[in-house]
Structure formats: structure tokens, C-alpha cells
């Protein structure tokens, strides 16, 4: 009884100015000649009619039940003209009845399938008494596939578009049901398309082969997948944007961390100026048969003949190795050929070896056999590439970071020929 009195009071406040308001059952705001319809919808009429009227007039009653009916009653309640008369009443409603009473009438027939716009929604059709009161949401969705019904829904302006996709005519009706309308429905507001898994597999396969779809192929896929060309075009647009976003995220992750799986690996190493890049370019160069390849590799790694900056930049770190043989090597370094690095037996043309030192190609134990570079002694003309004496004056050697101990330490460290190259890789990685 609380419910009845609540709706009585609300209806009295809303419809007090209209025609006779007889009793506590909530009927009779409208013109009197409608007894069959009132008798038919006695149980849910007062409940839904009052709730729809409250919501259609914008009076947001803080009642839980009326909020539950937001999706179900909003759309019929907002449709003013086409639902002017229920099917059971003999004449349509009289002209003096306003849009409010029409909306309250419209709330009655929507018993269990509220957002339906069945075939008899137009005001001219007064047949079809009760069939669409028994419909569920799914059956109304199927009916809305036909263009006639969709036109009826859109033309009514009531916002009851295809099964649950709200039309733009009703302001609050949009998205009330929350269902996805079928792709064929021409509702005034385009619904979100639900693709089946088979369609998605085909679309993804096509996107894998070609990210941009030409029109003949698009028409072919539309026929194959029972979709419209527009849907396929929009799916490809969205998929391209997603692909671009994924690539951007991958690029950010790879620049902050290790080498990216798809990108070029040396890029982050070059940016940090690490010795890994030098090691990668140096290790294959030891087996290279001719001196020019050896020289080119070291130009890439250390840029010695033209520019001595990268080793100077990185030689702060190598100084943490204890330079034990430094005292006995330094005098020879300064004697030999204007300050070139190397062993005490160094003569005229020092050769730059991978450990960072200069070694003489003539004596076998110290110079070329450090890294198995025996071919260097047979090419005296190639030594011009590696001869560091003219560009590397002693002023550069005693520059910002004193590299004598480091380089002599490294070159003396690897005196045994076979183990030199094996020990070289871990040393250079940790520099």
C-alpha cells in the first residue's frame, strides 16, 4: 500500500490539472473512454505509468524502483506522438490530451519488452492488440532488422532505436538498455558493432597481410563476412591506430631498456657510448684477412685516426684496474716514436691492437701475436692506417685522463697469445 499511496501523491502532484482523478489505483488521468486498456494493464499500469511520467517530466524521484525502470520506461515515456493511442482503445486520444498524457499512455503497453518498436508502433495502425506485450528483448531485436521498423523507431523520435541502442530523439534514452544492436539496424545513433570471432579472425588475417585495404578487396570481404563496407573500413582504421600505439609503446620500452626486438640493436648502445658496441665491431675484425678491414673496424669503434674523443671519454672507467706494470713501461712509451703506446721493444711503426694498446709488429711475443695478427707484419703499407704517432702527440696522451697505465696494463696483460682474445671479451664488457 505504500507504493500505491506514493504513486498517488506523485501522480496528484503531476496530473492534478488534468481530467478526473477518481481513486487510489492511479488510473483516470486521461479521457474517460478507455476502460478495456485500463482493465488489461491493471497490475503494471499504475507502476510503470507513474514511473514513466515522473521520469518524462524530469522529476527525478529518489525511489529505487523508479531508478530500476530507467532503461525500460524511459524510451516509451519520451515518445510523444506515435504512441498516442493504445491498440485496445476504440478511438485515438482526443486532441486536448497533452504530450504528458500521451507519454503516460505509452508507458502502459511496454510490459516486458519496453524498448520495442514493433510493427504497429505508428499511430495509424490500431490493430495487433497484444502480441508485442509478450515479446522479449531478443525477439524485438530480431524484428528491428527490417528497415520498416527501424524507420518507425527513428521517425517516432522516441529514442527507442534497435534493441537497446538509444535513438537521438529521446535525450536520456540513449544507451538505456545497453545492448548492442545488430549491424543492419538503421538507428539514428550508430550502435557499437559486435563482431563474431570468425569475422575477427578473417579481419586480423587480412590486416596481417595488408594494413590498407583496397576497395575491391573490401567489397569482397564485406560479402564474405556479412558486414558492410563501412564497418570493415572503420575496423581497419581502428586496427591501424592500435598497431601504431603498440609500436610506439614498444619503441619507448626498448629505448629505456635493452635492444628492441624489432628495432636496430646498436641504437641504445650508441646512445650510452658503452664499450659493447666497440666489442661487437672489434671481435670479427681480428680474423679479417686484410689490414684495411681492421683499420675500418677501429675507426668505427674508437675513431682513432681522425678523432680521439670516444676513448678519452671512456678511459675514466678503465683506470680502476691496478696499473701494476706502469712504471717500467712508461719510459719506453715516451721514448718510442713520439709517445705511442706499446711494449719496450717497440721500433718504428706501432700497430694498434684490440686491447687498446699499441704493439710493435716485429717481435713475435709482444706485438702481432697478441691477437694473432701475424698478417700485419707483412703489410708495412697498411700500418699507415694504424700508426698513431703523428696524430697522437704526447699532449693528447697527457690530456684529461691519463691513459698510459690502462693501455700498457691491457697490452701487458694479454701477453700469452691464445688466452689474450679469450680474456679480452669479459674485460671490455665490464669497462
UniProtKB/Swiss-Prot annotation:
Q: What does this protein do?
A: Sequence-specific transcription factor which is part of a developmental regulatory system that provides cells with specific positional identities on the anterior-posterior axis.
Bias (Gly residues) occurs at 151-179
Question: GO MF annotations for this entry?
Answer: DNA-binding transcription activator activity, RNA polymerase II-specific; DNA-binding transcription factor activity, RNA polymerase II-specific; RNA polymerase II cis-regulatory region sequence-specific DNA binding
What ranges does the record list as Polar residues composition bias?
139-148
A single cellular component GO annotation: chromatin
Q: Which spans does this entry mark as compositional bias, Pro residues?
A: 83-94
Which Pfam family, any one of them, does this sequence belong to? Homeodomain
Q: Which gene encodes it?
A: HOXB3
Ranges of the DNA-binding region feature: 188-247
In which organism is this protein found?
Homo sapiens (Human)
Question: Which residue intervals are annotated with compositional bias (Low complexity) in the record?
Answer: 95-104, 111-120
The record's listing under InterPro entries reads: DUF4074, HD, HD_metazoa, Homeobox_Antennapedia_CS, Homeobox_CS, Homeodomain-like_sf
Q: Which SUPFAM superfamilies match?
A: Homeodomain-like (SSF46689)
- Where is this chain's protein located in or outside the cell? Nucleus
Residues spanned by motif Antp-type hexapeptide: 129-134
Task: Return the protein name.
Answer: Homeobox protein Hox-B3
Determine the domain of life of the protein's source: Eukaryota
Kindly list the biological process annotations in GO that this record carries: angiogenesis; anterior/posterior pattern specification; cartilage development; definitive hemopoiesis; embryonic skeletal system morphogenesis; face development; glossopharyngeal nerve morphogenesis; hematopoietic progenitor cell differentiation
Q: Which UniProt keywords apply?
A: Developmental protein, DNA-binding, Homeobox, Nucleus, Transcription, Transcription regulation
Region annotation Disordered: residue ranges? 63-125, 137-192, 246-273, 381-431
Amino acid at each position: 500500500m505504500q507504493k500505491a499511496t506514493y504513486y498517488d501523491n506523485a501522480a496528484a502532484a503531476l496530473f492534478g490539472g488534468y481530467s478526473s482523478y477518481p481513486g487510489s489505483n492511479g488510473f483516470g488521468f486521461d479521457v474517460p473512454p478507455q476502460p478495456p486498456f485500463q482493465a488489461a494493464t491493471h497490475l503494471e499500469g499504475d507502476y510503470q505509468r507513474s514511473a514513466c511520467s515522473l521520469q518524462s517530466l524530469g522529476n527525478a524521484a529518489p525511489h529505487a524502483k523508479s531508478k530500476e525502470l530507467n532503461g525500460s520506461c524511459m524510451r516509451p515515456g519520451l515518445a510523444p506522438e506515435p504512441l498516442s493511442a493504445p491498440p485496445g482503445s476504440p478511438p485515438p486520444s482526443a486532441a486536448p490530451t497533452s504530450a504528458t498524457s500521451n507519454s503516460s499512455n505509452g508507458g502502459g503497453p511496454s510490459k516486458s519488452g519496453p524498448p520495442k518498436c514493433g510493427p504497429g508502433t505508428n499511430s495509424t495502425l490500431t490493430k495487433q492488440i497484444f502480441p508485442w506485450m509478450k515479446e522479449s528483448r531478443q525477439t524485438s531485436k530480431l524484428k528491428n532488422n527490417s528497415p520498416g521498423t527501424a524507420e518507425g523507431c527513428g521517425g517516432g523520435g522516441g529514442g527507442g532505436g534497435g534493441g537497446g541502442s538509444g535513438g537521438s530523439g529521446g535525450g536520456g534514452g540513449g544507451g538505456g538498455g545497453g545492448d548492442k544492436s545488430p549491424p543492419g539496424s538503421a538507428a539514428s545513433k550508430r550502435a557499437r558493432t559486435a563482431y563474431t570471432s570468425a569475422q575477427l579472425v578473417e579481419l586480423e588475417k587480412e590486416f596481417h597481410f595488408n594494413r590498407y585495404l583496397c576497395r575491391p578487396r573490401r567489397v569482397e570481404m564485406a560479402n564474405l563476412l556479412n558486414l558492410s563496407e563501412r564497418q570493415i573500413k572503420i575496423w581497419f582504421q581502428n586496427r591501424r591506430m592500435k598497431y601504431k600505439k603498440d609500436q610506439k609503446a614498444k619503441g619507448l620500452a626498448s629505448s629505456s631498456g635493452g635492444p628492441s626486438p624489432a628495432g636496430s640493436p646498436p641504437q641504445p648502445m650508441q646512445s650510452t657510448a658503452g664499450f659493447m658496441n666497440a666489442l661487437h665491431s672489434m671481435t670479427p675484425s681480428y680474423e679479417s684477412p686484410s689490414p684495411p678491414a681492421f683499420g675500418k673496424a677501429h675507426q668505427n669503434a674508437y675513431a682513432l685516426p681522425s678523432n680521439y674523443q670516444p676513448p678519452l671519454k671512456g678511459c675514466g672507467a678503465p683506470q680502476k684496474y691496478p696499473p701494476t706494470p706502469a712504471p717500467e713501461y712508461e719510459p719506453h712509451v715516451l721514448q718510442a716514436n713520439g709517445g705511442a703506446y706499446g711494449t719496450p721493444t717497440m721500433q718504428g711503426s706501432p700497430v694498434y691492437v684490440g686491447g687498446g694498446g699499441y704493439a710493435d709488429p716485429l717481435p713475435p711475443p709482444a706485438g702481432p701475436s697478441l691477437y694473432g695478427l701475424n698478417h700485419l707484419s707483412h703489410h708495412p703499407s697498411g700500418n699507415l692506417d694504424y700508426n698513431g704517432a703523428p696524430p697522437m702527440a704526447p699532449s693528447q696522451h697527457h690530456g684529461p685522463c691519463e691513459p698510459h697505465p690502462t693501455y700498457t696494463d691491457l697490452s701487458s696483460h694479454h701477453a700469452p697469445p691464445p688466452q689474450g682474445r679469450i680474456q679480452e671479451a669479459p674485460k671490455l664488457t665490464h669497462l
